[in-house]
Structures are given as structure tokens and as C-alpha cells.
């Protein structure tokens, strides 16, 4: 890696160091760039290693941190003009709480963002093929779920011990002083204490929680996603004969067979059925396996030990957070109840002498809509009560009739597009019935009339718009798990404040 030194003013706002670019416009901390010499000093220790910089990536000097904190607190510098600006004032609200902790927190956020994200980008780009083929959640559900026998469902732990984060960063940041600084900041801010790892509006700009959360999830993805190919190469040959060994061990007492362990005794056809499939959505991940129950239990134990000792997990709850081993018939995910239904096909086999008809069995991905999801979602938005009885939307009474009907039609379009993958269309018909009754109740409450008088008019108008919206629905003969469609629908769900 080429090492460049010089004045930051001469190099311009875009500083180039090998393949790593620093653009000051991308950072949210203008106070830290008042002393550019101190900023580039934070990168000096890493660059001083020369060609071995990648081996110790992220080794930073805390001398620059102290200088930056001192420059911010320097009374001789006039920071009042900077505080008067609206943008900087919004970023420095924390100064009212702690004049020392706030610049310390901003500097910690800056170093973590620079030290961790380029490494994440480099690792993900080198393994992009594996990430694209396995980590796509919808392809995982379509292609892998129906072929699996057991599903491991787990949530990322919400409460971590603070030392767990320190141990994670210790592998990337070799500066012991900075790690002690992180410990102080984490304990002061109580990072991850009682917080979920994904909240749409939880993270604020400039918060140290954002790089910590992203790096933590990236570490779990790297541990669970990347090594499976290497596990198959180096470990599956040792894991595959486990079931065979148990069977043969029982046969030893019934016969004089003597089992000999060698490479030729490995059944590679048996090894091919031991694939592990991994998928994650927000803070919940699924691991599907095609192996036997014994192999899955062994892999579950191996995974638990791996995560426990790799991340040094210390959770408030004594219950293991990764212990749900489910069959492919009762998995709740993305607002669906995921099923792998058995299907049979008649196959005609023609031979020289005769024609035979045989039955070929298989599994098909069969997502269903649970009643609890519909009732809970509609009750949250005040379209029905928690027993499923439709009620009027009182917040929409002040709107015009057209806006009320348009609101219900838009809600139906979102539901029908998202739940179009369901095989039980009866639940969709029940959903439109609930929305129709709620629409009638809303219009009746607005005009202070009975539902019966308005039903004819509202039914005609709403049904015409619903029929017109059918062109947006995907055909049942095609795959409906489209990431672009689901992404657009999730945006609508976020706007409507409907959680999945």
C-alpha cells in the first residue's frame, strides 16, 4: 500500500491512501476537523506499518483523541460562531449534558466508522458470490426451505454484556488504550442495554450505537455464512460418518464386522445431504438443514459453542438464545407461517415392454397467513378490535368520502401484494371483508347514518377500485417473492406504522 504524507490542505478535501478514501463531507462531526493535523495523526499509526497495514488494520493512537478533545475544550478558540449554526447545534446537543463525554463520543464514533467499515467492504466484496447466492432471503425461502428437514430459528440477543463488544473490537483495533476508552464510553452510554438491534427510528445521526450494531451483525453474518463452505471441505468428512458409526457400532455385537476408519469409507452421497443454509432478516436468522435429526442436534451444539466462545456471550437471561429447533411446518417468519407441504406428481415411465405410471413425491414452499397477524395488525391501526370485530376508523372521520375509500383501497393493495404469496386465499378474502366493514362503519360514523344505507354506494366504489388494483397483483403461476416488490411494500408498511 502506498504511503502518502503531506499537508491536508494541499491534498484537498479528498485524501487518498491506497484504496481507502476519506471524504470529510461524509462525516457528521465538523468539530473534529478543526484540527486536521490531529485527524490525520489518528491514521498515522496504521500507515506507519507500510505493507503490513492490512494485518493490523485499525490500530489507532489515542494521543490524537486526547489532542482533539483538548482542542475542542480550548477556551482560546472561538467555538461560539460554530455553535450558532443550526446544523452544528443539532449535532452538539449532547454538550449540554457532558462537555467532556460529547467530544469523546464523537471521536469514538469517527474512529469506529473509519476502522471497521472499509474492512467490512473488503471482506464482503471478496465473497460477493456466496453472499448473493445464499444470503438472499427470498431465494433462500423459495429454493432452500422446502428442501430442508429442520429449521433453527434464533434472535440476536438484545442484552449483551459490555465486555462482549470490547472483545469483538479487540480483534480489529490493536490499540489497548483505545479499547479502555471504548469501555468507558460504552459504560457511560450503556450501549445495547435493553435495546433491540433493529429499530426503524432508534438510531440517531452521530450515535455510536450505529457502527457498533452494524459491526456486531456483520461479525455474526461472517461467522455463520462464510465458513460453511470450508466446513464442508474440512469438517463434513469427519461429521458424516457419525450416523454411520453409530449404526455400525450396534451391528458389531450382532456380527463379526470390524469397522475401520479410513478415507475410503466416507459415503459422499451421504455428505451431500448435510448442507447448511443460512438466511437473516433484521435481527432474526434461520438456519435450515437437510441432514438427519442427530446431525442437526450435533450442528446445533457446535453452533452454540462456536458463538459462545467466539463472541464471549454473557446474557442476562440464563436461557440459551439459540435453542429453537423446529420442523418445516411451524416456522413464523416475515408475517407468514412457513410450511413445506408434501406434493405428489404422477410420472409416466415408458419401457420397451410396457408403460407404467408412478408417483413422485416432493416438497413445495407453502406460505400461509396466520389469523393472529391479520387481527393484530388491523387492531393496531384501529380497524377492528382484538377479537376481530370490524370497527370504524375514527381518525379518518374528518376526511372526505373519496379520501376514506382511497385509504382503504391503498391498504388493501399493500396487503394483497405482500400476502399474495399465500396459498390460502380465504384469509385474503376475510381481510377484504374486515376492511370493507370498517370502511362502511367509518362512512356511517361520518354521516351519522346506518351502515345499510351506505353499503350499496361504498361497495360499488370500493370494489371498482379494488378490481382496478388487481393489475398490480402478481400471477400465482410465477414466483411472488420478489425482493423489489417486498421492499416497496415494506416501505408502505413503515409509512402505515405496521410492523412485521
UniProtKB/Swiss-Prot annotation:
The protein's name in its UniProt record: Maturase K
GO cellular component: chloroplast
InterPro entries registered for this protein in UniProt: Domain_X, Maturase_MatK, Maturase_MatK_N
Function: Usually encoded in the trnK tRNA gene intron. Probably assists in splicing its own and other chloroplast group II introns.
Species of origin: Adiantum capillus-veneris (Maidenhair fern)
Coiled-coil segments: none
GO molecular function: RNA binding
Compartments, as annotated in UniProt: Plastid, Chloroplast
Keywords tagged on the record: Chloroplast, mRNA processing, Plastid, RNA-binding, tRNA processing
Pfam families cross-referenced by the UniProt entry: Intron_maturas2 (PF01348), MatK_N (PF01824)
Family in the record: Belongs to the intron maturase 2 family. MatK subfamily.
